[in-house]
Regions:
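Hydrophobic, aromatic-enriched alpha-helical segments typical of multi-pass transmembrane helices
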Residues: 1-249
């Protein structure tokens, strides 16, 4: 590896800038998929209306799906980036948080298969003529419901990831304590929503969702912007990294 390559590898600021860009893309793509695509096309409790809207806006639905699959790629990279940035605080806890984030991505990726299943069921292939249109609409809607529940399940792991990364940020000394505290609260909200969705899905969707998700948005947006614009306090990061290396030497 060249000296320049080693310098880039060793620079926490490089990781921070890349993480900021990726995090902001994740937020934009996720909001597009949730608010503009599913929020505009899925009619709660009405399989036929949902099928009609998706058929009429299939390109939009596919764009949302593609964008969210790209967030999976970005989230795996974010797991590595946040591990590198926060390992001076605690190697083991940073690794645990990163693994929780990768687990979230794996479950979320599987859940997206059910959106693909809905598209297949609403397609025009000849073999689908063996089914009544109402059956296809019901099966497609059921697939979308499974996607929603799978997404909720994935948030359990994402919540633990956010809460633990938030704790590490708050204790780091080279990233804002307030952002860390907000991320901890947001992570607890994700955990509470995920568990509530499994125990009382209707209550979780109608009552808890907006309130439990509220702290998470400013925390994640703030972290993305901070990483992109300010980065980390390199001197403090290097001091903690050096202290750890001396301790294990």
């Amino acid at each position: 590896m060249t000296r320049r390559g080693r310098d880039l590898e060793a620079s926490p600021q490089t990781y921070a800038r890349a993480g900021g860009i990726l995090y902001l893309f994740i937020i934009v793509a996720a909001l597009f998929g949730e608010a503009f695509v599913r929020g505009g096309l899925i009619v709660s409790g009405d399989a036929a209306a949902t099928a009609q809207r998706i058929a009429a806006s299939e390109t939009l639905f596919r764009a949302g799906l593609a964008g969210e699959m790209l967030t999976c790629v970005c989230d795996v990279a974010m797991a590595v980036i946040l591990y590198v940035l926060l390992r001076p605080v605690s190697r083991n806890l940073a690794l645990l948080a990163a693994l929780w984030r990768v687990t979230f991505v794996a479950i979320y990726g599987v859940a997206k298969l059910f959106e693909i299943a809905a598209l297949v069921l609403l397609g025009q292939d000849d073999y689908l003529k063996a089914f009544d249109p109402r059956q296809l609409h019901a099966l497609a809607y059921a697939s979308l419901r499974v996607h929603s529940l799978g997404y909720g399940l994935s948030l359990l792991f994402f919540g633990f990831c956010c809460a633990l990364f938030g704790t590490l940020i708050r204790r780091s000394g080279y990233l804002p304590r307030a952002l860390g505290a907000l991320l901890e609260i947001g992570g607890l909200g994700y955990i509470a929503f995920s568990l509530a969705q499994m125990l009382a899905p209707a209550f979780a969707a109608r009552v808890l969702f907006p309130w439990l998700m509220l702290p998470a948005f400013p925390a994640e947006l703030g972290l993305g912007l901070w990483l992109l614009i300010k980065g980390v306090d390199v001197a403090r990061w290097e001091a903690r990294e050096s202290a750890w290396r001396e301790g294990v030497a």
